[in-house]
C-alpha cells in the first residue's frame, strides 16, 4: 500500500494539495476502513462495499449509510425523531 509516515494513505497524492488536506483525507479514510458496529446483529463486522453501501460480514445484512461512515450525524437525528 502506498503511503507516507506523515499522511498515511494520502501519500499517493505526493506533494499535491497541501499537507492539511492530505491529513484530513487520511483521517477520513482511516475511519472508513475500520470495522463498524452492525445495526442488526450488533457485531463489529461492517465493511464498506461501495459509496454509501455497507455490509455486515457476520449476518450478511446490507444497508445504506453515509459515504464514509455507516451512520451519519443527520441519520442519528432522523432516527431519534422517528423513535
Curated annotation (Swiss-Prot):
GO cellular component: ribonucleoprotein complex; ribosome
GO molecular function: large ribosomal subunit rRNA binding; structural constituent of ribosome; zinc ion binding
Presence of keyword Zinc-finger: yes
Keyword flag Iron: no
GO BP terms: translation
Record keywords, A-Z: Metal-binding, Ribonucleoprotein, Ribosomal protein, RNA-binding, rRNA-binding, Zinc, Zinc-finger
Cofactor: Zn(2+)
InterPro entries named in the record: Ribosomal_eL37/eL43, Ribosomal_eL43, Ribosomal_protein_eL43, Ribosomal_zn-bd
Zinc finger (C4-type): 38-59
Record's cofactor remark: Binds 1 zinc ion per subunit.
Pfam families listed in its UniProt record: Ribosomal_L37ae (PF01780)
Sites where the protein binds Zn(2+): 38, 41, 56, 59
Family membership noted in the UniProt record: Belongs to the eukaryotic ribosomal protein eL43 family. Putative zinc-binding subfamily.
Role played: Binds to the 23S rRNA.
Subunit structure: Part of the 50S ribosomal subunit.
Protein name: Large ribosomal subunit protein eL43
Source organism of the structure: Pyrococcus abyssi (strain GE5 / Orsay)
Gene: rpl37ae
Amino acid at each position: 500500500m502506498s503511503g507516507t509516515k506523515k499522511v498515511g494513505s494520502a501519500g499517493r497524492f505526493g506533494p499535491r494539495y497541501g499537507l492539511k488536506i492530505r491529513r484530513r483525507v487520511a483521517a477520513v479514510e482511516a475511519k472508513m476502513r475500520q470495522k463498524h458496529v452492525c445495526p442488526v446483529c450488533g457485531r463489529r463486522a461492517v465493511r464498506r462495499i461501495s459509496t454509501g453501501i455497507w455490509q455486515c460480514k457476520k449476518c450478511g445484512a446490507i444497508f445504506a449509510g453515509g459515504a464514509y461512515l455507516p451512520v451519519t450525524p443527520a441519520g442519528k437525528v432522523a432516527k431519534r425523531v422517528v423513535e
